[in-house]
Amino acid sequence: MLEFSQFDRRRYPTVPVREGYRQWLPSYETTVEDEMDVVLLAPLERVPWAAVERAADLGCGTGRTGAWLRKRGIARIDGIDLTPEMLAIARGRGIYERLGQADVAGTGLEDGAYDLVTTCLVDEHLRDLRPLYLEAARLLRPGGVHVLVGYHPHFIMTTGIPTHFDRATGEPVAIETYVHLLSDHVSAARAAGLSLGEMRERLVDDRWITLRPRWAPYRNHPVSFAMAWGKP
């Protein structure tokens, strides 16, 4: 893990994760783009989407990932998140079987109960990745898959942009952010007994530049990534 402060070019005031997402909630659904995370899910070939009977969505937020999973035909989805206000929105979608407030490293969900565990845009808020991967491995059935989608460390380090939002006043605010190299993920996942089956990266392209014109200088830089980890 690398401290984000050495790459920080914005120097926004920074708030803890739960408080940050509570404050971000009014504009969250309109400012987080599917291009960052959801578009990376469908291309994953090592995930047997049609065979998944039960999924756990860790750091489910407002239910964006859960909604995508439901559209893929996954009927039984449990979700956990740290922020009660986010969970209230997720609950209103009516797609989760169970929802609970918990940390991704200690969900309280059942051992070996899930074919799929998803963690999207969460890892950059964790100082240590190991507890997350250990928890995902605990939740998975043998043969299950943990899909992690993250903010690419290259983009964080190159741009100096943390996870952030604008308050209603227009003031930008950062949410506590850490930088994990891709090798950090490999080390943490292997220590948890998981094996990497597939990885995808999302580049800044025309679609992204239409959404974020200021990102034009970063064309063809990776902005996010997805990893599919299997449990033997």
Task: Give the positions of each predicted feature.
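A short glycine-rich, Lys/Arg-flanked "PGG" loop and its adjoining helix->strand segment in the class I
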Residues: 130-145
